[in-house]
Each structure stands twice: as structure tokens, then as C-alpha cells.
């Protein structure tokens, strides 16, 4: 199976790297030429456009920063849609909106190709080691066909149901992680001002009912004096906004979600969109 990979950013680059290391035939496309050159040195082929990439490969993967960018890569004149043909598979690994992935999915189907959504969860550090979780929605047979590729990118792979279901689950998990991160920041502030031993505090939280994946990973970064959790303000606002909009679409009033969006909007205003 020939694999095309569009988007070599924080997560996408690590996923594509796992495929290359495991000897898959990979063609890449990325607007940042320095990243393209890096992957060429690793053994990847380089496509001149998303359309060319889709024409040359069987499984086309997109891992992009926003639904708007995904739409541009798919629908532009030299985009993926114009390079698709019968039985090719498009796997959208970006964090996106359920309605948007279904809209693009219908266009993929019109080309007699097969759409799947396959967002990931677990953070960049896990993506780098092939230890990330992958949720996949869409045709079960197509899912099984690409499973060998999925299992080298992620250790835990879950088929979630119909197209779009994986994107909904991903938005929910990212919302929970964002809430945990905000709560963790407040907890560490109080712990420090209470003059607690922070190493013992870390261990105490880890063995208590207050533990979480976010604590086990991000608290270590915080204790090392860094804010760099490989996730910027603009990305967390995108994710929390997707969850908040989903709740509104479902006519489900929420209390915490709007406050979380407000907190990160304030953070972006103070520190900028690319602050950690």
C-alpha cells in the first residue's frame, strides 16, 4: 500500500515518521520546505501538490491544524479531491468538526473513494514513539484494510462507528484534557503557595483520586520550569471551541465549557496565539 501524508507539523510529522521507520512507501506534501527536505532525507517521496500525492498513492492521510486548512487542501484546484479515484482511501487525522468531515466525506464518495476520520489522542511525545491512541470512524472494511498502517502510528486503535463519530469522540477527549489542564494549573498554584514539597505533591496526586493523564504528563513539564506542552493557545481554543459549538448544536446547555473557552481566550489575548 502506497501512503500519502499531507501535513508534517507537531503531530503529523511524528505519525509520518513512524510510517517511514516501519518501511511503508510514503509520499509527503507540506508547505514548509524545510520539513519536506527533512522527510526526503528519511526516505519519503515528495509530491508537488496534494492532487499529485492523491494520484500516486492508495491511502491519503491529512493531519492539519484546522478544518479550514483541511477544506483548502481537499477542495482547491490542485487539491486531494481532484486526485482521487475508485477505492482510494482518505483518512482525516486532523481534529475537526463532525459536520465538516461528513461534508468532505460526501465529496470523497462522489469520486468512488472511501472517507474515514481518524483523529489521535495522547500528545506529541506519544505520537513520536508510535504510542498514541487513534479513533477511526467510517467503513469497517476500509478500517481493517489500513489497520497495519494504523498500528505502527498508534498502539491503541479504536473503530468508533460511522464517519464523524471519531471526530466527536476526539473533541470530547480534548475538552476533558483542557479542563484538567486548567484545574491542574490552579492546583499547582495553591500547592506552591501552601509551601508543599512539589515533588511529593506530584507523587501524592498521582496515587490519588485526583490523578489524570494530564497530571502524569504535563505536571512533569511544569515542575521542570517549562510551559512547553507542545500545544499552543490557538490550537486549544480551536478544540474547546469545537466542543462548545457541538454542545450548542445539540441544544445542550453547559456551565464549565463556556468558562474554559473564556479562560483560553483571555490567555491568548495576554500571551498571543502561539504561546504554550
Please identify what each model-predicted range represents:
Residues 129-137, 158, 162-194, 206-217, ...:
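Active-site-proximal catalytic alpha-helix in oxidoreductases
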Residues 26, 46, 115-116, 157, ...:
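Hydrophobic beta-strand scaffold residues
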Amino acid at each position: 500500500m502506497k501512503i500519502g501524508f499531507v501535513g508534517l507539523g507537531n503531530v503529523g510529522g511524528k505519525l509520518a515518521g513512524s510510517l517511514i521507520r516501519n518501511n511503508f512507501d510514503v509520499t509527503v506534501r507540506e508547505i514548509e520546505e524545510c520539513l519536506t527536505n527533512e522527510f526526503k532525507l528519511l526516505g519519503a517521496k515528495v509530491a508537488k501538490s496534494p492532487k499529485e500525492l492523491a494520484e500516486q498513492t492508495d491511502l491519503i492521510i491529512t493531519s492539519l491544524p484546522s478544518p479550514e486548512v483541511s477544506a483548502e487542501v481537499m477542495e482547491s484546484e490542485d487539491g486531494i479531491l481532484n486526485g482521487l479515484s475508485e477505492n482510494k482511501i482518505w483518512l482525516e487525522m486532523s481534529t475537526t468538526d463532525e459536520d465538516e468531515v461528513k461534508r468532505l466525506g460526501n465529496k470523497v464518495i462522489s469520486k468512488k473513494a472511501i472517507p474515514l476520520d481518524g483523529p489521535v489522542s495522547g500528545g506529541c511525545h506519544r505520537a513520536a514513539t508510535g504510542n498514541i491512541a487513534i479513533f477511526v470512524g467510517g467503513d469497517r472494511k476500509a478500517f481493517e484494510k489500513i489497520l497495519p498502517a494504523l498500528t505502527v502510528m498508534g498502539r491503541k486503535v479504536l473503530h468508533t462507528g460511522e464517519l464523524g463519530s471519531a471526530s466527536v469522540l476526539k473533541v470530547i477527549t480534548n475538552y476533558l484534557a483542557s479542563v484538567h489542564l486548567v484545574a491542574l494549573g490552579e492546583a499547582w498554584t495553591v500547592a506552591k503557595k501552601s509551601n508543599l514539597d512539589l515533588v511529593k505533591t506530584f507523587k501524592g496526586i498521582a496515587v490519588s483520586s485526583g490523578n489524570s493523564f494530564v497530571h502524569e504528563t504535563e505536571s512533569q513539564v511544569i515542575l521542570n520550569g517549562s510551559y512547553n506542552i507542545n500545544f499552543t493557545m490557538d490550537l486549544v481554543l480551536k478544540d474547546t471551541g469545537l466542543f462548545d459549538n457541538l454542545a450548542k448544536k445539540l441544544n445542550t446547555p453547559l456551565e464549565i465549557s463556556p468558562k474554559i473557552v473564556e479562560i483560553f481566550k483571555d490567555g491568548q489575548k495576554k500571551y498571543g496565539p502561539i504561546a504554550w
